[in-house]
């Protein structure tokens, strides 16, 4: 277990990986562990793609963020084979047929996408309270 995980941003995690102080698998395991503990409290990650993320671990070796866990916003971001709902019940079964350019760039940079985050319906409000997945709570104000 990597207890200091929450003290690092993506750049800091990439630096630890580059120095081989931790492995991509260990980082992903910690991200999954933290998600399983915290998400029931805040409801931020309705789509968990842990198995898909494990497949991504060997991709893009040598990329600047190779092995850094990453969450993709479920708002106009397509990752082939996953639901792209945009926070709407209208799209709750919309499986992406392709991976969009921005998501490809994240993957090309070596980021490991392990889930999609909750979003307001079509991004139309400033708070995340969609009917589809329910509200996301402020982690600093539980």
Segments and roles (model prediction):
Residues 2-142:
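Gly/Ser-rich catalytic/binding loops embedded in alpha/beta enzyme cores
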């Amino acid at each position: 277990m990597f207890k200091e995980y929450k003290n690092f941003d993506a750049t800091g995690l990439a630096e630890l990986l580059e120095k081989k102080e931790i492995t991509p698998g260990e980082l992903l395991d910690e991200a999954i562990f933290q998600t399983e503990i915290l998400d029931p409290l805040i409801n931020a990650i309705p789509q968990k793609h842990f198995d898909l993320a494990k497949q991504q671990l060997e991709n893009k070796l040598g990329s600047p963020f190779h092995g850094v866990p990453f969450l993709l916003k479920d708002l106009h971001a397509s990752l082939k084979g996953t639901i792209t709902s945009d926070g709407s019940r209208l799209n709750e079964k919309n499986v992406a047929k392709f991976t969009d350019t921005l998501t490809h760039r994240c993957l090309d940079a070596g980021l490991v996408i392990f889930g999609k985050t909750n979003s307001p319906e079509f991004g139309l409000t400033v708070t995340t309270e969609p009917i589809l997945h329910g509200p996301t709570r402020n982690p600093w104000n539980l």
